[in-house]
Amino acid sequence: RIWAATFAGGINYISQGEHGETVFINHRNNLKGYPIDVCYKARFITSDNNGRLWVGTTTGAVAFDENFKKPEDIQFHHFSRVPNDTKSLSNNDVHWIIATQQKELYLATFGGGLNKLISISENGHGEFKSYSVLDGLSSDVLLSIREDHKQNLWISTENGICKFVPSGERFENYDERSISFRVRFSEAASTLTSGGDMLFGTSNGLFMFTPDSIRKSSYVPPVVFSKLMVANEDVIPGEKSILKVDLDDTQEL
């Protein structure tokens, strides 16, 4: 089955008519249950490991069973941010959704950081765990996500690339200081090559790297004292000063 997301008319299921013609099934015909009144701006469609399709929209996420017989019978579940409910989505603008090798589902939001699906109840209520700059993200504006062969997630953000290690819930950030130049990543523009390289779209071409070659620096810079001030005034070395010789040559005060 082929699905298409539109930024004005929700989603479309592309099928064939009785005479082989292409037919677009949407909220105007047989896709009656889709919440078009609130989720008409769809950004992204993907499947998870439990037979569900997920739609990222500007007003939350929509999920439904992909094993349906007739489009009109699909039951859609809409998940959105609920004020004061920390187990709901942290932000409604969902840019990207990824199902991982560990059968987990993560959602990248524009302003609410990263969300992980914890569970969906029988009545369709979703529980999520969110990660933000308070947890180590470099930015809460996330644009896309890719998973490497070690099951780490690489996230393009407004402030560079972020590596998320799900097993330890740990973030490693790589900004322009790490990359040596400023990169402005594009929305929902990334892929993983057959060789394991990551490619992310930017405002100035493609940004490509091999995940295994990206490591945090272990260099610990030395502590160097260059100036001594007392009461907001510089201390000059001298016989009547508490600093007898230059600060570089002073062992203790």
Question: Model-derived features: where do they sit?
Answer:
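Conserved beta-propeller blade signature
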Residues: 1-4, 52-55, 104-107, 152-155, ...
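Solenoidal tandem-repeat scaffolds enriched in leucines and small polar residues
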Residues: 5-9, 40-44, 49
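Beta-propeller-forming repeat regions
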Residues: 9-11, 206
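Residue-level "micro-hotspots" composed of small/polar
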Residues: 19-23, 28-42, 59, 68-98, ...
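A structural signal for beta-strand register positions
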Residues: 49, 146-149
